[in-house]
Structure formats: C-alpha cells, structure tokens
C-alpha cells in the first residue's frame, strides 16, 4: 500500500506538471495566467474595499450601470477577469472581487470562516452594498467561485438576473462524479495534498516564503510564456507576484478545500482511506430555497479540463431549468484565459439576451 501511495502521488504530480495550465509545486497548484494585451490596462480599474460579513474584501471595478460580479477560484484573484470586465464595462459596473483569503482581502485563520455558507453570505452582502439592495445582478464565476455561485443561486435566486459558470463543479454532480467515476476520483487526488495529507517527501506550505513562491511562479510556466508572447507585460507579471506574495494567501486559498471536506469519498481501498469526511452536497446546500436552479444559466466549459472532467456536465440540465452550454473542445480548466476574447463575447451575448443555442452535444461528450 505504501509503494502504491508513493507511486500514485508521484505520477499525479508529474502529470500535473506536464499539463499546460497548472503545475504542482511544493504542494501548491499553480494555475495558468490570463493572456492579455501587453500594454497596461490597469489604470482603467478602481480599487476599493467593502466591509461585509465580518471581513474586509478588496475589489476592482470599471464602468457604470447594473452590476456584473466576477468571482475567481483557486489560486487566482480578481485580475484573471480583466479582459471580460473591460468588455462588460461598456454598459455595466463590472466588479472583480478578491474572495476572502486571497490577495488584498481579509484572510481569517479559522477554517469555519471558509465554509461555503459563509462564502455565499459574503457574496450576498457584497452585492447589496456595491450593487444596491433589491437590484438584480449578473454573476460570473469560475472554479471555487463557481461552487459558491451555484449555491448562491439556490439560496438567493431573486437576486440574480443571470448566472454564468465557467468550469465550476455543481455541488450534486461533483458528489456523484467522485463517488461513481473512477477517473474523476483519480483526477481529484491533488486535493489530499491541499488538505495537508502530503505525499512522502512533500513539504508543507511555509507562509514565510510567499514572496519566493510568487516570484518563482511568475517567472516560470504560463506567466513567463505569456510575457514572452507579448500578451503580458512586466507590469502584469508583477501583479501576480504581488498577489501570490500576500502573507496568508496560500493557506487562505487552501482553506476552501479544508473547511468543506473537498476530498474524494472515503473507501477502504483509497490510499488516503483514513480520511472519513468527504464533500457533501446536502451539507453545503442546506437551507436553499430550491436545489433546482431556475435562474437563466450559461455554462462555459473547456473540455480538456484535467481536474474537473466532462462527466460534470452529464445530467446538468436536470438541476438547471433554463440552461445554455457553450463548449470549447480544445481548451482546459482555464478557458477564460486561453480564449479570453471569445469568452468575453460569450458573456456579452448571453447578458444581452441574444439567441444563444442550447447545445446538446455535452450530453454525449460527457460520457
């Protein structure tokens, strides 16, 4: 069993190092960086803070009009959305939020502060403060931000004009996939590392080295590649270094997994079978008005996502009453980075209510 465990984690780490948008470095998953024009556009954004739900959340905004709110996932920050925000700022107040635990937002140290129900309440209070009470808004979300957005739509459908999800696991389908799909269980093994169940020889996160981590990440992999391509400027690179170097930001991001038992399900044959708690959709959606989402919803999905396999799309229409799906067959988990202009156009088109075909290919492609 020990040999199997070592081999599994070694193979998994190597596999994740090879894939384009991610690398596993010292137990931290380092994601790809948003391709964008090399000239600086940061002056277009206004930085601000909102005190909500017992924390101070940083956000960037651009434009005027009804609110469209962008939520990032792990291990990102608001800046991943800058191209989509600029597009939507032509007729919206486009806001990119630093979720709690990230970049310039508060970073509580207790795990309870990262429960999904707490994150949902962050979004509710923030949207009311920035967008106004009793005013509907559009919510765009990715990865962990998407998990929060799914649950938010179940609790507060009356607050949403539209919901746009980009490669983000639906709570109930995620639970099904890690229980029934062996490939998805294997793809989710990195979460054991995130939760502190390290592979032999793996080093735990050292928050005193965040500047070193941030600098190393930004000078290797896709950050450096995008700079060399001319999509990113040195100013863009430095923004990511600064975000990843914030004290507590590494642990803050990992606490999303730890607080919500984001583990593949317990079973006797799993190499980490001593972990008795796993993801519970029932727990994270408790108190929802309805687990069937009636808000008009667009799901954008990069089909080559190595972490969230396409099985997450199978049967999604049973949980979402008004669903449209846009597939990107050659993109991965970071489709909004790889296809930033196309995704911005998708968001624009869907928000404007233009004819957006309800693709059905995902039902066959997902299995």
Set out the residue ranges of the language-model regions.
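N-terminal secretory signal peptides that target proteins for export/translocation
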Residues: 1-16
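Bacterial N-terminal signal peptides
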Residues: 20-32
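Boundary at the C-terminal end of the N-terminal hydrophobic targeting segment
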Residues: 36-40
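Flexible "cap/lid" subdomain of the alpha/beta-hydrolase fold that forms the substrate-access gate
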Residues: 41-45, 55-57, 67, 95, ...
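Conserved HGGG/HGGXW glycine-rich cap/lid loop of the alpha/beta-hydrolase fold
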Residues: 61-104
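Active-site helix-initiating loop/hinge in glycosyltransferases
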Residues: 73, 115, 338-339
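Short, hydrophobic alpha-helix immediately C-terminal to the catalytic nucleophile
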Residues: 82, 150-154, 344
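Catalytic active-site module of serine/aspartate enzymes centered on a nucleophile-bearing elbow/loop
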Residues: 322-367
């Amino acid at each position: 069993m020990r040999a199997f465990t070592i081999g599994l984690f070694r193979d998994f780490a190597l596999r994740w190092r090879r894939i384009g948008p991610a690398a596993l470095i010292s137990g931290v998953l380092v994601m790809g960086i948003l391709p964008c024009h090399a000239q600086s556009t940061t002056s277009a954004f206004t930085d601000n803070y909102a005190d909500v739900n017992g924390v101070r959340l940083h956000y960037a905004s651009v434009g005027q009009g009804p609110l469209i709110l962008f939520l990032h996932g792990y291990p990102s920050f608001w800046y991943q959305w800058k191209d989509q925000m600029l597009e939507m700022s032509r007729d919206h107040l486009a806001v990119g939020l630093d979720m709690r635990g990230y970049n310039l937002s508060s970073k509580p140290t207790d795990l309870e502060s990262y429960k999904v129900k707490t994150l949902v309440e962050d979004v509710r209070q923030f949207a009311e403060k920035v967008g106004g009470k009793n005013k509907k808004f559009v919510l765009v979300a990715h990865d962990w931000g998407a998990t929060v957005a799914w649950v938010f739509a179940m609790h507060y459908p009356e607050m949403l004009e539209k919901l746009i999800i980009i490669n983000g696991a639906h709570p109930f389908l995620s639970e099904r996939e890690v229980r029934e799909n062996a490939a998805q269980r294997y793809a989710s093994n990195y979460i054991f590392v995130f939760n502190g169940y390290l592979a032999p020889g793996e080093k735990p996160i050292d928050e005193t080295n965040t500047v070193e981590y941030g600098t190393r990440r930004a000078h290797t992999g896709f950050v450096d590649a995008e700079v060399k391509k001319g999509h990113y400027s040195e100013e863009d690179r430095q923004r990511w270094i600064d975000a990843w170097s914030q004290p507590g930001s590494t642990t803050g991001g990992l606490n999303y997994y730890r607080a919500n038992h984001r583990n593949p399900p317990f079973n006797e044959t799993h190499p980490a079978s001593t972990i008795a708690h796993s993801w519970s959709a029932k727990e994270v959606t408790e108190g929802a008005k309805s687990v069937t989402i009636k808000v008009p919803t667009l799901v954008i999905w990069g089909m080559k996502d190595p972490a969230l396999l396409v099985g997450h799309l199978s049967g999604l229409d049973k949980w979402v009453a008004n669903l449209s799906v846009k597939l990107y067959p050659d993109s991965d988990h970071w489709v909004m980075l790889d296809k930033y202009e196309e995704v911005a156009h998708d968001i624009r088109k869907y928000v404007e209510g233009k004819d957006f075909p309800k693709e059905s290919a995902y039902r066959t492609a997902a299995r």
